[in-house]
């Protein structure tokens, strides 16, 4: 039960990172634009008073503010895309769903008189104190905030994952597959809006009561508890879920424009813009002292406690991790260096983090952030606005550094903790990050994860690879650490490997390898051993010379579709080349061209051809049909055979194959189009086997 819940929470946590990743850019625009309009700043830098400079400053501030004003919509889109493995259709569905949900709530609220229908009265209504309602994207509606966006995003993703391969009757074929998702999402969002009218008001009332009581009862204790829990969740990657309500939904503030703003971070940005006294930032400011000073001091303590022969190695590891923490506030590379080998140190660190939040609250210092508590955000939201006692972070940080340094050194010696550089000789194997070649790292990580076949789901956030594997026993955690992971967390079949800011790039490289788009720089194995390598062999160098008109016929009878309708991103994203797809109504596949057979996959589900004119074509029958290992497929050609248009290549038992694969949609891909060439579909609806003029290659 816990493992399943952890997997779900992990997915939601990484999905939240997509909209959150937008905020630093918006925050920079807002902070700099506001600072350029600050009266104290203008007195020092007189050129800022120029009308043109002030115009630019106003534009920058507005450009940043619009992002924070529309966070619910951004969360709806970001969460949907994140939970749908990056597919943009889910994002479109989320936009439609969010608009429909709000319009449906608005219609009811206007009809029953809760919100005035008269525009003048409605404008007055929103300038008064009605925090339960908001004018979102011009729609007078219930104030569901970021939670409303997240709910719609989850709904859109669930519907996408359920229906993106749906097949409808032929007369409704245009609306099949991914096109069906926005339709079903809009209907579901209409129902969701009506449900939210009933369930959300008491939920909102409870959230308001909780957040108000939390601050009024004992804000200092609340800040301490927040800091401890937020750090404690770092190993599980669930801290995003914990802090999101505090940053984006709890608490409220009425802006100068009369708008009700919710969430510690959003309120801080609004108060910066309004030029009022800062009251927000309690649940952000505490990060600066321990991220900029405390953890780097902990790194120094670990270095000083390392064995003399290991100090040079530890200096490199700890130095880079400490610098990363100081500049950017990314702390995982440093935290995970001692989390698993010395959990007691991490427990101490969590308490110190809570202490940092508590002290900054007692001093009433308010500094917001968009990314994390490093020097960059400290300058943008503390020093540049100059609206709070930002300088107090430095003495508090230095004091915390002393506590971290001596606290860590005492604990390491007292409990003989095996922090980096203090391992027993038997444990001191390869140095972290040492691999044969830099370009081999993603391959080595895949092997340490149990190879490609063991990867069920692959994703990443800012600091860690998040992998769901089929068999966790095949994962070599020690090897992952040797490859540079500062920590590896395992909960059931969910693996998190902490590679720091490189994680997202490594994920992309690993996805390329899994998709067969980046051949390993070493001798290839037999083509019979790996289907993925055979796909690579089909992808040739682009054509350099123009090809005259060739006879090209439909290889299958069925319904023709653009290749973007294929429910597989390798094909729909045109990663192997442009083309088209056919949803078969019968199981016979014929040659579309005159030429030769380049490749017949061992599983018989795909064939590569080359026309006499040099065009190379891949016919891939169905999606994930490789898993059938040839069952239901009969091949009538072999590699090197000459073929004519209409000659039989394959016969497929549709009744046997269809129930066992996600879709029968068959992509036909031109894998070596010249630069600038694209495939356009001339036919529509159903096409017959051997039918000519169904597609055209254009420049």
UniProtKB/Swiss-Prot annotation:
GO terms for molecular function: D-glucose transmembrane transporter activity; kinase activity; protein-N(PI)-phosphohistidine-sugar phosphotransferase activity; protein-phosphocysteine-sugar phosphotransferase activity. It comes from Bacillus subtilis (strain 168). Residues 3-424 form the PTS EIIC type-1 domain. One of its GO terms (biological process) is phosphoenolpyruvate-dependent sugar phosphotransferase system. It is found in: Cell membrane. The EIIC domain type-1 forms the PTS system translocation channel and contains the specific substrate-binding site. Residues 568-672 form the PTS EIIA type-1 domain. This is PTS system glucose-specific EIICBA component. It catalyses: N(pros)-phospho-L-histidyl-[protein] + D-glucose(out) = D-glucose 6-phosphate(in) + L-histidyl-[protein]; D-glucosamine(out) + N(pros)-phospho-L-histidyl-[protein] = D-glucosamine 6-phosphate(in) + L-histidyl-[protein]. Keywords: Cell membrane, Kinase, Membrane, Phosphotransferase system, Sugar transport, Transferase, Transmembrane, Transmembrane helix, Transport. It is a multi-pass membrane protein. Disruption phenotype: Deletion of the gene reduces the growth rate on glucose but has no significant effect on growth on glucosamine. The gamP-ptsG double mutant grows slower on glucosamine. Deletion of the gene negatively influences the growth of the cells with maltose, N-acetylglucosamine, sucrose and trehalose. The phosphoenolpyruvate-dependent sugar phosphotransferase system (sugar PTS), a major carbohydrate active transport system, catalyzes the phosphorylation of incoming sugar substrates concomitantly with their translocation across the cell membrane. This system is involved in glucose transport. The system can also transport glucosamine. The chain crosses the membrane at residues 16-36, 66-86, 89-109, 139-159, 180-200, 233-253, 283-303, 313-333, 338-358, 365-385, 388-408. Induction: Strongly induced by growth on glucose and glucosamine.
């Amino acid at each position: 039960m816990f493992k399943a819940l952890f997997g779900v929470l992990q997915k939601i946590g990484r999905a939240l990172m997509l909209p959150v990743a937008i905020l630093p850019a918006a925050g920079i625009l807002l902070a700099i634009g506001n600072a350029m309009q600050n009266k104290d700043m203008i007195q020092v830098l007189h050129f800022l008073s120029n009308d043109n400079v002030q115009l630019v400053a106003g534009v920058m501030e507005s450009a940043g503010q619009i992002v924070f004003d529309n966070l619910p919509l951004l969360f709806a889109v970001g969460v949907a895309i994140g939970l749908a493995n990056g597919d943009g259709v889910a994002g479109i569905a989320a936009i439609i769903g969010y608009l429909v949900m709000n319009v449906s709530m608005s219609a009811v609220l206007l009809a029953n008189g809760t919100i005035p229908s008269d525009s003048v009265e409605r404008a007055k209504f929103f300038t008064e104190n009605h925090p339960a309602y908001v004018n979102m994207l011009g729609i007078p509606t219930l104030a569901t905030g970021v939670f409303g966006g997240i709910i719609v995003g989850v709904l859109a993703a669930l519907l996408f994952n359920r229906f993106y391969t749906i097949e409808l009757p032929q007369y409704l074929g245009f609306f099949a597959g991914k096109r069906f998702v926005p339709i079903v999402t809009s209907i579901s969002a209409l129902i969701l809006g009506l449900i939210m009218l009933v369930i959300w008001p008491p939920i909102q009332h409870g959230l308001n009561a909780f957040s108000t009581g939390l601050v009024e009862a004992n804000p200092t204790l609340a800040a301490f508890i927040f800091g401890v829990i937020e750090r404690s969740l770092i190993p599980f990657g669930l801290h995003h879920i914990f802090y999101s309500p505090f940053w984006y939904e709890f608490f409220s503030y009425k802006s100068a424009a009369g708008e009700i703003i919710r969430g510690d971070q959003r309120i801080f940005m609004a108060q910066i813009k309004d030029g009022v006294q800062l009251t927000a930032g309690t649940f952000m400011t505490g990060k600066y002292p321990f991220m900029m000073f405390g953890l780097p001091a902990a790194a120094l303590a670990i270095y000083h406690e390392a064995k003399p022969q290991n100090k040079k190695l530890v200096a490199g590891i700890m130095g880079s991790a400490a610098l990363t923490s100081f500049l950017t506030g990314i702390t995982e590379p440093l935290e995970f260096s001692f989390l698993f080998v010395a959990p007691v140190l991490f427990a101490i660190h969590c308490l110190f983090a809570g202490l940092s939040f508590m002290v900054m609250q007692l001093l009433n210092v308010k500094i917001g952030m968009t990314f994390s508590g490093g020097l960059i955000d400290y300058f943008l939201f503390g020093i540049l606005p100059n609206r709070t006692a930002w300088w107090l972070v430095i003495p508090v940080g230095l004091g915390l550094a002393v506590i971290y340094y001596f606290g860590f050194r005492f604990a390491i010696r007292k409990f003989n903790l095996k922090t980096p550089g203090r391992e027993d000789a038997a444990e001191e194997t390869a140095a972290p990050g040492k691999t044969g070649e830099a370009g081999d790292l993603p391959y080595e990580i895949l092997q340490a994860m149990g190879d490609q076949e063991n990867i069920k789901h692959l994703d990443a956030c800012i600091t860690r690879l998040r992998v769901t594997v089929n068999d966790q026993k095949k994962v070599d955690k020690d090897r992952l650490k040797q490859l540079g992971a500062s920590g590896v967390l395992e909960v059931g079949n969910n693996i998190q490997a902490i590679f720091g800011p490189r994680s997202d790039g490594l994920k992309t490289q690993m996805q390329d390898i899994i998709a067969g788009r980046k051949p390993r720089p070493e001798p290839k194995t037999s083509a019979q051993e790996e289907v993925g390598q055979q796909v690579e062999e089909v992808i040739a160098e682009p054509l350099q010379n123009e090809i005259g008109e060739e006879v090209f016929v439909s290889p299958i009878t069925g319904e023709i579709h653009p290749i973007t309708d294929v429910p597989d991103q390798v094909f729909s994203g045109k990663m192997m080349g442009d083309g088209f797809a056919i949803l078969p109504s019968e199981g016979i596949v014929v040659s579309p061209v005159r030429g030769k057979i380049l490749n017949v996959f061992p599983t018989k589900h795909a064939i590569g051809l080359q026309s006499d004119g040099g065009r190379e074509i891949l016919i891939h029958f169905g999606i994930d049909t490789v898993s059938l290992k040839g069952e239901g497929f009969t091949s009538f050609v072999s590699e090197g055979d000459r073929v004519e248009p209409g000659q039989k290549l394959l016969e497929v038992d549709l009744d046997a194959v269809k129930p066992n694969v996600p879709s029968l949609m068959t992509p036909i891909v031109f894998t070596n189009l010249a630069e600038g060439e694209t495939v356009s579909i001339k036919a529509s609806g159903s096409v017959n086997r051997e039918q000519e003029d169904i597609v055209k290659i254009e420049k």
